[in-house]
């Protein structure tokens, strides 16, 4: 870990404002116990003890930014339904700006329900509509996006392939408009079609997504540095970040070359939402001008903390600060 002042970082984070635009998801948890088998069929009987909701997808990216003391506006689509109302209420409770969350009558709010017993996930139930947003909604988003862009330092595009960016022309416009306004834009991709992300500051695939893109582009799936270099040049990126799960984070920057940061996870209970934490950390620490190596180290620490939590939960700056003080000697 490099020498840096935690107090200085915290002070700077409080002055940052970012926009998260993407697929908003509501996560619901059924928590209980399994102690017997059903007499009706050879399946376990789940005794429900608790139900709770949390922010997922792009909304979880926004929640992580709030945990890092960054001011946030969130843009995305929900259904005109009870789950959409719950998502917006949760976002407001976290201090997330929601003027960019629009409703669409023809689609339900995306909700993922996880059934958990004895700290283990037994089942996940998804309710979603995977279709592009309407042209009318696109137009409304464009108007709000141009307005919010003037207020923020940068943009995080969180693509979960649920509808926001299934229109390649709309996605490309989002990226180009940020560049035109000289705002950085980082992408957490779902698609292997990176043309729509061209010109972004960075793209942050996980290893599986990187391999799929490399395969499509006829590049080596094993030589990270060589393939990353080609992708950075082809898609006009400032740099590329690849998350490697338990193996940490890899980055390629044309001037700084390849940078590898090992994982800082102590215990892994649940990896859901870890990618959201990484992209939020990259955006927050990039916005305050930290060097890329230090940004990756902090993102790794943040990811290592959230995988030790059960369920989709954000990281908090205090947790990162405590981890560093316990595991590294901080030099002021």
Q: In which residue ranges do the predicted regions lie?
A:
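Short acidic, glycine-rich surface-loop motifs adjacent to enzyme active sites
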Residues: 152-165
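Positively charged, low-complexity intrinsically disordered leader regions
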Residues: 1-35
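Substrate-binding N-lobe of the ribokinase-like
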Residues: 2-10, 39, 43-111, 323-325
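Structural motif
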Residues: 19-21, 124, 153-156, 186, ...
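Conserved post-catalytic alpha-helical subdomain immediately downstream of the catalytic base
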Residues: 238, 264-327
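Conserved phosphate/ATP/ADP-binding segment of small-molecule kinases
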Residues: 162-258
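Conserved phosphate-binding/catalytic loop of the ribokinase/pfkB sugar-kinase fold
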Residues: 101-107, 114-151
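A short, aliphatic-rich alpha-helical micro-motif
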Residues: 13, 149-150, 194-198
